[in-house]
């Protein structure tokens, strides 16, 4: 049986010590996956930072990211995720979601609620193109990539 743990912000402040203990405990007890959510205004570890840390500290634990791409450059996001997949030996799991439900978080990220789906429709294919190793030529109202290639590629194909 696989047991996966999703880490959500609690009632108290986040601490490096508690996260370190959690990661070590999950690995030692044979849990399958740790999932971190992208909650920019919550007192929680950022998924990119937390999963990179967990990748370096564990050898077996799968690393799940529940990411909101809004406010992130897709080229840099593709590179960061590919590097976490590389550093972990292919243990990254990814769930991309259209955005947070909180109006204050949407406003802080600069994304009206009505645009979340369209944003995701543009970003997900871009991530896949960057991970394929192809030269990406893309221009839109949101992004402009004048023939760029992202390296390294993820271990997993497809990620």
Annotated model-derived regions:
Residues 1-58, 62, 157-158:
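N-terminal beta1-alpha1-beta2 module of alpha/beta enzyme domains
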Residues 40-42, 68-71:
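Short histidine/acidic/glycine/proline-rich micro-motifs that form metal-
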Residues 151-159:
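Short, intrinsically disordered, charge-balanced linker/junction segments flanking boundaries
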Residues 35, 65, 108-112:
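Short amphipathic alpha-helical segments at helix-loop
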Residues 2-14, 70-142:
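Flexible, glycine-rich active-site loops centered on histidine and acidic residues
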Residues 47-48, 77, 148-149:
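Distinct, well-ordered alpha-helical segments
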Residues 61-67, 92-93:
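A short, small-residue-rich loop immediately preceding and capping a beta-strand
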Residues 142-150:
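Active-site glycine-rich loop that binds ribose-phosphate moieties when present
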């Amino acid at each position: 049986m696989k047991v996966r743990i999703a880490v959500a912000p609690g009632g108290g402040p986040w601490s490096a010590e508690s996260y370190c203990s959690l990661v070590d405990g999950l690995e030692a007890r044979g849990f399958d996956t740790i999932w971190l959510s992208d909650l920019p205004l919550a007192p929680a570890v950022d998924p990119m930072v937390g999963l990179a840390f967990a990748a370096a500290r564990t050898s077996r634990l799968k690393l799940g990211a529940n990411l909101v791409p809004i406010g992130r450059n897709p080229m840099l996001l593709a590179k960061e995720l590919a590097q976490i997949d590389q550093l972990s030996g292919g243990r990254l799991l990814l769930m991309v979601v259209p955005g947070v439900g909180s109006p204050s978080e949407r406003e802080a990220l600069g994304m009206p609620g009505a645009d979340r789906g369209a944003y995701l429709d543009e970003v997900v294919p871009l991530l896949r193109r960057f991970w394929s190793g192809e030269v990406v030529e893309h221009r839109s109202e949101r992004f402009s990539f004048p023939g760029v290639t992202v390296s390294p590629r993820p271990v997993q194909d497809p990620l």
